[in-house]
């Protein structure tokens, strides 16, 4: 009876990126991290991060440092859709520009190695309505309302 009353403790799957857990990823240098990334990301990091990318990382670190404990950091807005998500960015809030507005994205460990632009869609998906006049030959017989 006591066993039934005791709730089963939920176990969550520990995140790993290509077999390496998040704590180890945070301790790695860029050179070690590059070995885990796919070819496109390796090439990009080997060519180096530019001044704008470094300033984004600096602003993200500052926002994380100034955030109160157990709170989400302040949103950092950026136009850098081509920035590769690095392990040190995990937990940050980024406003990614889609050409019109800044979409808020919370960076999760599963996003490591992807680009920021992948999480901020630049177009409005099509919601197909009824066909209009001239859409097809059969649409001529649809009565106009």
UniProtKB/Swiss-Prot annotation:
Its main location: cytoplasm. It is found in: Cytoplasm. One of its GO terms (biological process) is ribosomal small subunit export from nucleus. PROSITE patterns: RIBOSOMAL_S19 (PS00323). InterPro entries: Ribosomal_uS19 (IPR002222), Ribosomal_uS19_CS (IPR020934), Ribosomal_uS19_euk/arc (IPR005713), Ribosomal_uS19_SF (IPR023575). There is a cross-link at residue 108 (Glycyl lysine isopeptide (Lys-Gly) (interchain with G-Cter in SUMO2)). One of its GO terms (molecular function) is MDM2/MDM4 family protein binding. HAMAP family: Ribosomal_uS19 (MF_00531). Component of the small ribosomal subunit. The ribosome is a large ribonucleoprotein complex responsible for the synthesis of proteins in the cell. This is Small ribosomal subunit protein uS19. The gene is RPS15.
């Amino acid at each position: 009876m006591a066993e039934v009353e005791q709730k089963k403790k939920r176990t969550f799957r520990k995140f790993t990126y290509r077999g390496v857990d998040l704590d180890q990823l945070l301790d790695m240098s860029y050179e070690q991290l590059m070995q885990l990334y796919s070819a496109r990301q390796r090439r990009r990091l080997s060519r180096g991060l530019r001044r704008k990318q470094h300033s984004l990382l600096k602003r993200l670190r500052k926002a994380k440092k100034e955030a109160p404990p157990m709170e989400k950091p302040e949103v950092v807005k950026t136009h850098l859709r081509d920035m590769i998500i690095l392990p040190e960015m995990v937990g940050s809030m980024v406003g990614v520009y889609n050409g019109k507005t800044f979409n808020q994205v919370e960076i999760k460990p599963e996003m490591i190695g992807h680009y920021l632009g992948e999480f901020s869609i630049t177009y409005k998906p099509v919601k197909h309505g009824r066909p209009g006049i001239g859409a097809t030959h059969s649409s001529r017989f649809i009565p106009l309302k």
